[in-house]
């Protein structure tokens, strides 16, 4: 049976798949951000801490606007103190202090908001922003494979994001969760995860891993990519919860900083937790004698 392309659902699907109006701005801003991220990661130290700090400032403001639109300034100040404090501790290589600071800020939020929902929103924002940022700096400072870890994260997440975007746009198909994000499709998830797996395999090859370890990179690339895509979906849930379309309009074609690096934040949590609390995870990736 031929599909009915005249119905409202089909027409909407065609509009979504054919809307490339923001592609130029999306590519240009993405290239600028990617270049800044790679350069900062390469130099590490205070350079990367400064970039992470700038991102934390922007994300804290975006979260404050979403969660407390009638009290942006005090919300921003609290979130900034929590998340930026975690970044500072992590830049001094005190990851445990960073986590402890976030816990203290979460407890302090009870004094300010006084309701369970308010505490969850404020404390959750500080942790959601500060935890991945601190882990990201910690991952970079790990010797001797810190830079390789960050570059692999970039490669996997960027490949996944790009192919998920184009795969979903071109192929369309069934939606994942229309109530959360009306444009995300299973085809995008599949193409994004596949691209992330291949990017992971490529990283294993570039890092001179043996054939067996390249298979590990392939599998972990898929896991990291899928985690990043779920982080993107979770960000959509948060925006729906707060009743906004984008976290902000800071980045042309992407929305806000939270919109742009949600996948990277989720992947950083996964990789950081695995390497911090699972010693075998490091051997699994870098056991080939890097």
Identify the meaning behind each predicted range.
Residues 2-222:
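Membrane-embedded alpha-helical bundles of polytopic integral membrane proteins
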Residues 260-277:
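Final/C-terminal transmembrane alpha-helix of multipass membrane proteins
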Residues 275-290:
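Juxtamembrane boundary at the C-terminal end of a transmembrane helix
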């Amino acid at each position: 049976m031929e599909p009915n392309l005249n119905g409202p659902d089909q027409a909407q699907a065609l509009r979504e798949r054919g809307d490339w109006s923001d592609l130029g701005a999306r590519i240009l801003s993405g290239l600028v951000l990617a270049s800044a991220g790679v350069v900062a990661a390469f130099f590490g130290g205070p350079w990367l801490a400064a970039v992470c700090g700038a991102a934390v400032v922007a994300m804290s403001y975006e979260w404050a606007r979403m969660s407390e639109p009638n009290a942006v300034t005090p919300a921003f100040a609290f979130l900034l103190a929590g998340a930026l404090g975690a970044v500072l501790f992590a830049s001094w290589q005190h990851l445990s202090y960073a986590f402890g600071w976030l816990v203290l800020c979460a407890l302090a939020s009870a004094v300010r908001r006084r309701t369970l929902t308010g505490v969850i929103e404020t404390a959750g924002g500080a942790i959601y922003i500060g935890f991945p940022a601190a882990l990201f700096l910690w991952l970079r400072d790990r010797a001797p494979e810190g830079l390789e870890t960050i570059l692999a994260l970039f490669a996997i997440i960027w490949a996944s994001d790009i192919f998920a975007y184009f795969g979903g746009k071109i192929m369309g198909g069934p939606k994942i969760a229309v109530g959360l994000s009306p444009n995300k499709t299973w085809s995008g998830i599949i193409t994004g995860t596949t691209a992330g797996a291949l990017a992971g395999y490529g990283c294993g090859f570039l890092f001179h891993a043996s054939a067996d370890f390249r298979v590990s990179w392939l599998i972990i690339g898929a896991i990291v990519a899928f985690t990043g895509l779920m982080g993107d979906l979770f960000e959509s849930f948060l925006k729906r919860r707060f009743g906004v379309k984008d976290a902000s309009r800071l980045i042309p074609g992407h929305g806000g900083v939270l919109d742009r690096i949600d996948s990277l934040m989720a992947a950083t949590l996964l990789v950081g937790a695995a390497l911090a609390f699972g010693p075998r995870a490091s051997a699994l990736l870098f056991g080939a004698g890097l």
